[in-house]
């Protein structure tokens, strides 16, 4: 089977590490001009800011939905609180119905929030990288500050400043960790 970007068979001695895996030094040998043009178009599309933003927003939405569902399933009402006592007095079916309704609403809320944060940060980082024409740690700090500031802006200037500082620090820490050389 001929898959663009993959070599067939075993890699010869002296080949680059990872040869035979998609995008790992295989190049476009053995592909027709049409296949090469298609691969280049796919790479160009994946590098565009709108596509990166949509992908990050979609992945954030999915992850947020799963996270919200998990967190809602872990929360429980104690029978020692007035709300817990009221729920425990309901019939079993009503308890289950309310539980699923709560799980759905929390899942939807988390999905929206994660999707917005993912799309906003990814889009901002892509634009900053394009404007600076560099791929370094500063892009993450600038993008984190802009994203945190936008997310905190509704709560006032102090919240926007705190969001800027917090999100920038978190983004810098994650990006610095991701850029560390692997121990191979």
Curated annotation (Swiss-Prot):
GO terms for cellular component: TIM22 mitochondrial import inner membrane insertion complex. It is a multi-pass membrane protein. Disulfide bonds join 49-126, 145-164. Pfam families: Tim17 (PF02466). It is found in: Mitochondrion inner membrane. GO terms for molecular function: mitochondrion targeting sequence binding; protein transmembrane transporter activity; structural molecule activity. Keywords: Disulfide bond, Membrane, Mitochondrion, Mitochondrion inner membrane, Protein transport, Translocation, Transmembrane, Transmembrane helix, Transport. GO terms for biological process: protein insertion into mitochondrial inner membrane. InterPro entries: TIM22. The chain crosses the membrane at residues 8-28, 54-74, 150-170. The keyword Transmembrane applies. Component of the TIM22 complex, whose core is composed of TIM22 and TIM54, associated with the 70 kDa heterohexamer composed of TIM9 and TIM10 (or TIM8 and TIM13). Belongs to the Tim17/Tim22/Tim23 family. Essential core component of the TIM22 complex, a complex that mediates the import and insertion of multi-pass transmembrane proteins into the mitochondrial inner membrane. In the TIM22 complex, it constitutes the voltage-activated and signal-gated channel. Forms a twin-pore translocase that uses the membrane potential as external driving force in 2 voltage-dependent steps. This is Mitochondrial import inner membrane translocase subunit tim22. The gene is tim22.
């Amino acid at each position: 089977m001929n898959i663009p970007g993959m070599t067939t068979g075993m890699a010869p001695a002296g080949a680059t590490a990872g040869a035979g895996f998609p995008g790992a030094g295989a190049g476009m040998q053995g592909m027709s001009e049409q296949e090469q043009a298609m691969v280049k178009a796919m790479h160009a599309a994946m590098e565009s800011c709108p596509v990166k933003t949509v992908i990050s927003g979609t992945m954030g939405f999915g992850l947020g939905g799963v996270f919200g569902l998990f967190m809602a399933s872990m929360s429980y009402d104690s029978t020692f609180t007035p709300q817990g006592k009221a729920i425990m007095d309901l019939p079993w079916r009503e308890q289950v119905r309310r539980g699923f309704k709560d799980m759905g609403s929390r899942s939807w809320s988390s999905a929206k929030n994660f999707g917005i944060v993912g799309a906003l940060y990814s889009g901002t980082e892509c634009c900053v990288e394009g404007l600076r024409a560099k791929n370094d740690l500063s892009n993450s700090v600038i993008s984190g500050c802009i994203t945190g500031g936008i997310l905190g802006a509704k709560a006032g200037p102090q919240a926007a400043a705190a969001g800027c500082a917090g999100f920038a620090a978190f983004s810098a820490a994650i990006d610095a960790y991701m850029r560390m050389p692997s121990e191979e």
